[in-house]
Amino acid sequence: MRVGIKVLGCPKNEADCEVLAGVLREGGHEIVFDVKDADVVVLDTCAFIEDAKRESIDEIFSFVDAKDQYGYKLVVKGCLVQRYYEELKKEIPEVDQWIGVADPEEIANAIENGTDLVPDQPETVYRYRKRIDLEERPYAYVKISDGCDRGCTFCSIPSFKGSLRSRSIEDITREVEDLLKEGKKEIILVAQDTTSYGIDLYRKQALPDLLRRLNSLNGEFWIRVMYLHPDHLTEEIISAMLELDKVVKYFDVPVQHGSDKILKLMGRTKSSEELKKMLSSIRERFPDAVLRTSIIVGFPGETEEDFEELKQFVEEIQFDKLGAFVYSDEEGTVAFNLKEKVDPEMAKRRQEELLLLQAEISNSRLDRFVGKKLKFLVEGKEGKFLVGRTWTEAPEVDGVVFVRGKGKIGDFLEVVIKEHDEYDMWGSVI
């Protein structure tokens, strides 16, 4: 059969679906990239926060509406199904099949058999199989573990992704070796919490060991690590990231807040002062290191005083990149039962105010790259410009770099940065 796959949500879903595509192809099926050519459409969903759930529901109805026109069977899978299977099956009977969070081979078998598959509790993480690119790009997301044991009070992920399950270093290395042979120039390690990698398998935080192993592989490529939980970002992990030459000095550390009161309510263990000390130590050792974070505004109990402390924290740290999100009240979490809910309009105002502050900081932080030579990865072309990124930007969440010159997708070029705005930079090939 001909199978089309549409991915919603985080990079971890993208990695899952590319592996699933590989398993389906190994089983004799054809992967197609236009739904009108598909016998079966697989829609992968997200259920992390309200906006993600709403997007997933909207996409389900969009694909339901197009079923009669194109004649495909619709399979909806992923986190939304794992979390709300019974409700979805009852409310949207037009969907042909529902699949939750499961191993790619189990999912492929279920698709072939036409049976629903929703485990009581996810217990597997995929082992390496040959994967298929669902988009043409010079980078790949590699999932090193699944699930999470951290228990942040606002987070619903453990309820539908299960507890921590790490892949072996050997299995991850095999996958990365094959991706490099296929021409990938950037390997992006993802998980719910990359700092926890290996605790279940090796009884220790094994991210430094994994990074050293991957860094030893031949070839010119970047290694980027995302989702570094601040409470467990150790000196050993920081040192490995700073010392290994293929690991970019980009620290994605979602601190979530800067008020000690709110951090405690969130179930975080590091205080704002401890966070400042840790993040400042990275900059002291590597002044050009990029610090990225995520912030939740409007958490239950957040007062104007707490918000002012957050702004002061952000101004003091001077994050290079920052994503600010309005708190999403998720059933089943500890925070769901907290009193003193913040008015949504107030939370939205705080989000806008924080993003305006961050725009000024980001603009100022980019000043240091003007006139500098940076390695640039070509990802495409837009008008007269090559479009891509330097090591200072992660795909999809950060800005891009526009460069005058010649090159093709996957080329590393040396460029000099000429100018920038709050998020993007412009330069030319040397």
Swiss-Prot record:
PROSITE patterns: MTTASE_N, MTTASE_RADICAL, RADICAL_SAM, TRAM. It catalyses: L-aspartate(89)-[ribosomal protein uS12]-hydrogen + (sulfur carrier)-SH + AH2 + 2 S-adenosyl-L-methionine = 3-methylsulfanyl-L-aspartate(89)-[ribosomal protein uS12]-hydrogen + (sulfur carrier)-H + 5'-deoxyadenosine + L-methionine + A + S-adenosyl-L-homocysteine + 2 H(+). PANTHER family: RIBOSOMAL PROTEIN S12 METHYLTHIOTRANSFERASE RIMO, RIBOSOMAL PROTEIN US12 METHYLTHIOTRANSFERASE RIMO. GO terms for cellular component: cytosol. The lineage of its organism: Bacteria, Thermotogati, Thermotogota, Thermotogae, Thermotogales. Residues 1-116 form the MTTase N-terminal domain. Its main location: cytoplasm. Residues 367-430 form the TRAM domain. InterPro entries: Elp3/MiaA/NifB-like_rSAM, Methylthiotransferase, Methylthiotransferase_CS, Methylthiotransferase_N, Methylthiotransferase_N_sf, NA-bd_OB-fold, Ribosomal_uS12_MeSTrfase_RimO, rSAM. Binds 2 [4Fe-4S] clusters. One cluster is coordinated with 3 cysteines and an exchangeable S-adenosyl-L-methionine. The two iron atoms in each cluster are connected via a penta-sulfide bridge. This is Ribosomal protein uS12 methylthiotransferase RimO. The keyword 4Fe-4S applies.
